[in-house]
């Protein structure tokens, strides 16, 4: 019995010793997939599992773990994780690089928009005989032209102008080619036109106390200066902000011995149609009635359009009439200046015949047989 027991112990020991031989085998190192896209793997090989310190029979679930070691599972998942990290890293770099690539693309688009905008050139020292078609022909070879303008004054061309191109690139090319070229003995200068700064200049009132300054002597002529009656025609812009002065002055000039028609009293002067702008001024001298008129020699009714028409726009057509005995009263002073106080004589009168109209650049006169003009 003892021998059988010792044999059973030995057999048990032998069976127990066989099990550790099977469990003592270390796990094989995991076989990782080769690196992809030339990027080295960021992981290291796992350490082998240490041998178990116990001895004994293993259960079936443990053998299933040996058939599917966790290292193998780790080796299969690690490359996927690495690939995911690699892809995400690449995507991040692409996103970061996207704005960098987009910035150069934005700048050319802005340059393209600037080149497609119109541009104006200032052309100076051009021949004085040049007109707009000549300047257009000179610059038209470089691109489409929107506008050509040569500056003129009353004497002719001022020798410079402006050319507007539809495309700024064409304008730059024309400036480079034509700047400094000699045309008819004159060196053309082409530069970029600069924007003109408009300043609010204070308008100088040419009137002193509402009356026009004489452009020759600079004296102020008003009704008080002439001892008599003045007829002031109503301005066309009455009631507007521009209506600040009389538009015309109607008067007659006389010489001693050349009387003018007598008329009714000064009460015939009714200023209702003058809207308060006209006024009658009486001098301190005796208002004597002149001698009977000379039928063959009449007066001259003169209206200077410069007083109203040229400054404030005035009337489109000047209206003039000669006073008649029924509508005018003559007052004379020691200098024999006669001023007509009229009722219906105004800028609106239509009693004018075209045969007496003599147009001039600034004035229009209603002339009768010309008198001998003497300066008093």
Swiss-Prot record:
Keyword Coiled coil: no
Biased composition (Polar residues): 72-89, 102-115
Keyword Nucleotide-binding: no
Gene Ontology molecular-function annotations: mRNA binding
Biological process (GO), any one: mRNA processing
Ranges in coiled-coil conformation: none
Comp. bias intervals (Low complexity): 90-101
GO CC field: cytoplasm; nucleus
Domain (RRM) ranges: 119-195
Binding partners and assembly: Binds to the C-terminus of ATXN2.
Name under which the protein is recorded: RNA binding protein fox-1 homolog 1
